[in-house]
Amino acid sequence: MVRTPFRGALLAALLLAGCARATNLLEPSGPAFTGQYALLGRDTLAIGPIRIVTFNVKLARRIDRAIEVLRSDSLRGADILTLEEMDNRGTDRIARALHLDYAYYPGAIHPTEHKFFGPAVLSPWRIARSWKLLLPHESRTRHQRRTATAAEVVVRGLTIRVYGVHLETPAGGSDRVREDQVMTILADAERFKGPVVIAGDFNSYGIGVLLERHGYRWLTRYAGPTISYFTWDQIFVRGLKPAGPEWAGVVRRTLGASDHHPVYAVVVPEVSGAAGLVKSPGTR
């Protein structure tokens, strides 16, 4: 086959983009970005379901559109929101617009976007503490390390451990790589006795079986594709259960904000007065 100079240049550019090296940020304490934009006066004693949302906002490029999507009916009023492929500015803009507190710990500087890249946790409730969790293995293409953003969110007096995750891509690592990354998250969560949420882009559907084996509910198992034909964006919980028959779904209208579709689930605590219930020091 004869290649034109343009075609050859295009192929070379794509190859270089795929192999560009990320700058990993492996210091556990940072960089760290937090913000407090949640409205005061929320009733911490109100009884109600807990809405969880996760959305991979592709490279944090179209933040205004992402905000509009997150204001849609099934996503509006999320108690726990995880965002993937975020940078610090995009995370702050979404938090300001939706009146949320947030914790954001980038795991790398993206090799082609040249900005921070990682998952974020946001909530209208108080984030008691947060940290970066380093995940094992380096991408075989971009040599990028993955991280999870972890936070403890006090929802109506119940402390919930939340992990915003974005596992390695199929091009960057094998199923075993993603399994090892999940096991690292599970080991970190094991020390916490209250409810746990693990949500984000897992770059795999079958990985859900591993989380189920370790006692997690796979809330979005039957929600449907979240990117093209693949069902990679998922929500798993421990110590929480579906709030009703229509507890989970995928929002199809994304307004061009991303190539991913946001996913949601609605839950309640498994047991009234479950571990993790604390007296809130104030209303938020």
Regions found by a protein language model. Give the residues of each.
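Surface-exposed cleft-lining segments at the edges of enzyme active sites
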Residues: 132-141, 165-176
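N-terminal, active-site-proximal structural segment of metallo-dependent hydrolase catalytic domains
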Residues: 6, 16-97, 109-113, 179, ...
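Metal-dependent phosphoester-hydrolase catalytic domains
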Residues: 19-40, 189-197, 202-284
